[in-house]
Amino acid sequence: MSSSPRLVLIDGNNQMYRAYHAIRDLTGPDGRSTNAVYGFITMLRKLISDHQPERMAAAFDLRGPTFRNQLDDEYKANRRPMPEDLVEQIEGVHEACRALGVPIVTHQGFEADDVIGTLATRAAATGLDVVIVTGDKDFFQLVNDRIRVFNPRNDGTWYEADRV
């Protein structure tokens, strides 16, 4: 990758789920779960500190059907719903992003993956280097000389054009 300006795109749902499952039974004084919020903040602060990106955004899914549901009634039909104690933490994760200066991007009718894919390819086409922060291997199809994937799990793994 060159020394071009860099855009970091966070797969918000993926990293929120990761935090939720990595830290169990963490609650606030009111008894409500805070594990996903705490884990997401920790990941985000480390990401900012370690990589000092020039531009950043976090993409999240919105509730409701997407264009894929219109194409296939069975799309994600067997997927379990998001746990209620995680649903209750979504706004806290969004607040953390805003507090740390990370814009949230969403688009009704599209998944966060679609938003990230669009932003990454458009940014790369304008000369920006792009880093997608996710544990989702589906993003490997986007990897090229301008787009890399970073999985922050453990000490972090980089996926570049010569490694996917």
Roles of regions detected by a PLM:
Residues S2-V133, K137-E160:
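Noncatalytic, basic helical substrate-engagement surface that gates or grips nucleic-acid strands
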Residues R163:
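Conserved phosphate-handling catalytic cores of large alpha/beta enzymes
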